[in-house]
From Swiss-Prot:
It catalyses: L-seryl-[protein] + ATP = 3-O-(5'-adenylyl)-L-seryl-[protein] + diphosphate; L-threonyl-[protein] + ATP = 3-O-(5'-adenylyl)-L-threonyl-[protein] + diphosphate; L-tyrosyl-[protein] + ATP = O-(5'-adenylyl)-L-tyrosyl-[protein] + diphosphate; L-histidyl-[protein] + UTP = N(tele)-(5'-uridylyl)-L-histidyl-[protein] + diphosphate. One of its GO terms (molecular function) is AMPylase activity. Its cofactor is Mg(2+); Mn(2+). The lineage of its organism: Bacteria, Pseudomonadati, Pseudomonadota, Gammaproteobacteria, Alteromonadales. Pfam families: SelO (PF02696). ATP binds at residues 81, 83-84, 103, 115-116, 166, 173, 254. It comes from the Bacteria. Coiled coil: none annotated. This is Protein nucleotidyltransferase YdiU. Its EC number is 2.7.7.-, 2.7.7.108. Mg(2+) binds at residues 245, 254.
Length: 484
């Protein structure tokens, strides 16, 4: 890997230099060829294993942990920072630079009495979801590899340590800006320094002046809205949408007790530390705006409040238009009619009625959408009908759907198009758990198979139909913890 060190050299007050503590008996548990290409790597090597496990220096790496703050479950925590993630620098790839971070690399000045380690189960889950979201076309950070070890660590019980090698276009979070506004009061110079760095690195078409700052914040608002619209479309619940887990670039970031929906449930909670459902699936769009409002508060020394409010008011439109584009494609409505305010309203109603029917009939979200690929949209009798208990309500919806859809000249092509946007395979929690159990038993094959399938989620994979099934009784509604 070839590194540049722009963050390290230009923002010395934004991090602490710290070196990883190596894990014992490191081994490759998983590797992403796709992610490796981003930073010019090909195959995993023994030399790379030593470096990324913290047991040898990586040429050109500087090693540091960033400082930031954030709102966690609605309350402000003035000092957080990378408690178990150590960044090596920005690796230069064929199409840009990517931060390389060792998540689970050992304690840092921000570990807050923690051991700085990640356990194998959380490392595997983060690896799988990073790559799964990418191949579902959801903006996300990436995962290069998972490195296992025999190092014992204690959570609720004894587990083994592991490292996820994360790749990110940037690790700058909403919480970075909050830290230098609230926790370091009077440091508007540092806030401006961070803002100028972010624009120069990631928005080079913008200027570092008043007009550029407003244009940048609008881009952040729109990118955040688009990311969350993608989550809602694929049925993804993040679980811990604290502001310190929000990427300034609108990439899905910092995965813990996440889940994809099995049975559709608007108020689905995937995090057992969130009993009131602050971060429930259906709350995510509202939380996204709330988090942007907290970012806006941090930017008041730089951008006038009236301008910030005006820009925040554009969030809903960006969210709705992205969501409509994605959902119209899922339903096959993309090329039908010229969008208008009234058409948007009608389409949102059509989509909402369909998801309400899914919830009332306890249908699997992913499977129900996938069934559209078998549908003859010109037939009066839908193949979906048998899945619904309340057939009269379905019939009413289906009639509205056919009216909106209009004529379909080439049914096989229409069906193929539906299968190209409605995945057959998602990372169901029970599948991740089965892969983790197999790794604990020394069997990596289920993990590697699951990774392979998730990189082609729209393909049929007829020989692996079992990975598309609804969860068994023990795997339904699994709620994960933040323990990692």
């Amino acid at each position: 890997m070839k590194f540049k060190q722009d963050f390290f050299t230009q923002l010395p007050e934004f991090y602490s230099q710290v070196y990883p503590q190596g894990i014992t008996k490191p081994e490759w548990l998983a590797w992403s060829d796709d992610a490796a290409q981003l930073i010019g790597l090909s195959q995993p090597t023994d030399e790379l294993l030593l470096g990324l496990s913290g047991n040898a220096a990586v040429d050109g790496a500087t090693y540091y942990a960033q400082v930031y703050s954030g709102h966690q479950f609605g309350g402000y925590t003035p000092r957080l920072g990378d408690g178990r993630s150590i960044i090596l620098g920005e690796a230069i790839g064929p199409n840009g630079a990517w931060d390389v971070a060792l998540k689970g690399g050992g304690p840092t000045p921000y570990s807050r009495r923690g051991d700085g380690r990640a356990v194998m189960r959380s490392a595997v889950r983060e690896f799988l979801v990073s790559e799964a979201l990418h191949h579902l076309h959801v903006p996300t950070t990436r995962a290069l590899a998972v490195i296992g070890s025999d190092l014992p660590v204690w959570r609720e019980s004894q587990e083994t340590a592991a490292i996820t090698v994360r790749l990110a276009r940037s690790h700058i979070r909403f919480g970075h800006f909050e830290f230098f506004c609230h926790s370091e009061r009077g440091r508007a110079d540092k806030l401006i320094q961070l803002l100028n760095f972010t624009i120069t690195q990631h928005y080079p078409h913008l200027s570092c002046d008043a007009a550029g700052y407003k244009a940048w914040f609008l881009q952040v608002v729109q990118d955040t809205a688009k990311m969350i619209a993608h989550w809602q479309a694929v049925g993804f619940a993040h679980g811990v949408m604290n502001t310190d887990n929000m990427s300034i670039l609108g990439d899905s970031f910092d995965f813990g007790p996440f889940a994809f929906l099995d049975t559709f449930q608007e108020d689905f909670i995937c995090n057992h530390s969130d009993p009131e459902g602050r971060y429930a699936f259906g709350q995510q769009p509202g939380v996204g705006l709330w988090n942007l409002q907290r970012l806006a508060q941090a930017l008041t020394p730089v951008i006038p409040s009236d301008d910030l409010i005006a820009i925040l008011n554009q969030y809903q439109e960006a969210l709705v238009q992205t969501y409509l584009r994605l959902m119209r494609a899922k339903l096959g409505l993309s090329a039908v009619d010229v969008p208008s305010v009234e058409q948007d309203k009608q389409d949102l109603d059509l989509i909402g009625r369909f998801t309400v029917l899914m919830e009332k009939n306890q249908l699997d979200y992913t499977q129900t959408w996938r069934q559209l690929g078998k549908l003859d949209p010109t037939s009066k009798h839908s193949a979906l009908r048998d899945d619904f208990i309340d057939v009269s309500q379905f019939d009413a919806w289906y009639q509205s759907y056919q009216q909106r859809l209009g004529a379909v000249a080439d049914i096989p092509t229409w069906q193929t198009e539906r299968n190209s946007v409605n995945p057959k395979y998602i990372l169901r929690n029970y599948l991740a758990q089965e892969a983790i159990i197999a790794v604990e038993e020394g069997n990596l094959a289920p993990l590697h198979l699951l990774q392979k399938i998730l990189t082609q989620p729209f393909a049929e994979h007829a020989e692996h139909e079992d990975l598309a099934k609804r969860p068994p009784d023990w795997g339904q509604g699994l709620i994960m913890s933040c323990s990692s």
